[in-house]
């Protein structure tokens, strides 16, 4: 039986100083595409340029999607340039080098990202950046890179942490968001900025800040070393969990975990629940909608992870939902939506199978309040949004409402709105002026 997590304890969690960059880079959640979920190691310039061209052709660029990110396996394996010590792009995959692809991406009015790791090798065994931070940052800047995803693989034993941190992820069998079986836990009150993980990630931050080119820094340390407490002074997004996979159980686990990280969301800083799986695996249409909607209202980075040249109209429509993107990219209100009621569980319950089901958040771009209702159950069920329960809507009994999926004006809705939802589906409402 799951118990409840204390709201008081959450309120006492510290906030971090934000890493403010030039030209607003990193102020809002990043929007873009990444090669890994679609292609893994099978990446090359053709696939990157196909994605870039499709982002323009499909109208994604017009909605704010701008980063085209190369993930792991882009370089020659097992060696660096003996003269410059730089990582060597694989010319079989990238005949014009990374800079050549960057030029083509920039010509489309888009930005380009690259991948490395805070270890000696990447997750796929390619050269990584630990000990070469300045060399690699200089190369990335020279090549025209705009975004760095920095992973946590290949860490040698002398760079591992003294203590283990609690990441209440799926495989850890978390008890109410804690890790009772954790080996070698840190003592209470331990300052994780003293950890080797913090040092490894700040070394690359400082190397990037030393370049004249502004490169968005996306930390991928899988939630380790209590990164939520220092991620925002180090980068503009930070992974708060282990990797995602294209199945509902994993998506629900990460959504549940990230629910308890919303106090860390704000301008310049965004907990990252990993790249999108919309269009991948055996996700149902309902699950694709719920996945994207939850990531968007949490003000997470929205990094597409599917092959865009074969995407279905239905999945493309999900990724292009203007209401959710406008909420995610609000230039005036930095906070995310928050759960106002858990629904399936008592409030503040940590349940990897049943995340909080009722969410709301104010939006300057939508000129109203976004309301989300999730059916986390395995069968069709009704969810009801009661206006007086929603913090932003307690002043009146009736409001004008728009269905964010269909765009339909639902008219003046009195007291509450009910929706019959298929398993793992969501209703998303834009609630505007009183009527």
UniProtKB/Swiss-Prot annotation:
Official protein name in the record: Probable alpha-galactosidase B
Entry EC number(s): 3.2.1.22
Family: Belongs to the glycosyl hydrolase 27 family.
Species name: Penicillium simplicissimum
Coiled-coil region(s): none
CDD domains per UniProt: GH27
Reaction(s) catalysed by this chain's protein: Hydrolysis of terminal, non-reducing alpha-D-galactose residues in alpha-D-galactosides, including galactose oligosaccharides, galactomannans and galactolipids
Residues with glycosylation annotation: 81, 158, 176, 232, 378
Gene: agl1
């Amino acid at each position: 039986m799951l118990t409840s997590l204390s709201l008081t304890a959450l309120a006492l969690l510290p906030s971090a100083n934000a890493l403010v960059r030039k030209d607003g880079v990193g102020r809002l959640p990043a929007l873009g595409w990444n090669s890994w979920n679609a292609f893994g190691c099978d990446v090359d310039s053709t696939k990157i340029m196909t994605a870039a061209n499709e982002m323009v052709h499909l109208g994604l660029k017009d909605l704010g999607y701008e980063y085209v990110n190369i993930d792991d396996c882009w370089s020659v394996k097992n060696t660096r340039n003996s003269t410059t010590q730089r990582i060597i792009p694989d010319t079989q995959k990238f005949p014009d080098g990374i800079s050549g692809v960057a030029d083509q991406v920039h010509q489309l009015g888009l930005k380009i990202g690259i991948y490395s790791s805070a270890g000696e090798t990447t997750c796929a065994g390619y050269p990584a950046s630990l000990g070469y931070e300045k060399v690699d940052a200089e190369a990335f800047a020279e090549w025209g890179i705009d975004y760095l995803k920095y992973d946590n693989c290949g860490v040698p034993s002398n760079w591992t942490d003294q203590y283990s941190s609690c990441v209440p992820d799926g495989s850890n069998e978390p008890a109410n968001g804690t890790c009772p079986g954790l080996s070698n836990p840190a003592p209470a009150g331990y300052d994780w900025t003293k950890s080797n993980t913090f040092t490894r990630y700040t070394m690359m931050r400082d190397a990037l800040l030393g370049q004249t080119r502004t490169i968005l820094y996306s930390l991928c340390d899988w939630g380790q070393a209590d990164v939520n407490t220092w991620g925002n002074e180090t980068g503009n997004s930070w992974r708060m969990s282990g990797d995602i996979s294209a199945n509902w159980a994993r998506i629900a686990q990460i959504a549940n975990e990230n629910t308890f990280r919303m106090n860390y969301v704000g301008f310049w800083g965004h907990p990252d629940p990993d790249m999108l799986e919309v269009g991948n695996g055996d996700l149902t249409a309902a699950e694709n909608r719920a996945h994207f909607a939850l990531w968007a209202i949490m003000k997470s980075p929205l990094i597409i992870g599917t092959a865009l040249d074969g995407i279905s109209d239905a999945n493309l429509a999900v990724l292009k939902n203007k209401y959710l993107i406008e909420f995610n990219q609000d230039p005036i209100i930095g906070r995310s939506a928050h759960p106002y009621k858990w629904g399936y569980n008592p409030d503040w319950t940590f349940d990897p199978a049943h995340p909080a089901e009722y969410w709301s958040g104010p939006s300057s771009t939508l000129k109203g309040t976004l309301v989300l209702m999730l059916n986390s159950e395995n069968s069709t069920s009704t969810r009801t949004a009661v206006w007086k329960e929603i913090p932003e809507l307690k002043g009146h009994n009736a409001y004008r409402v728009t269905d964010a999926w269909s765009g339909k004006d639902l008219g003046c809705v009195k007291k509450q709105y009910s929706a019959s939802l298929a398993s793992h589906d969501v209703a998303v409402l834009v609630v505007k002026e009183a009527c």
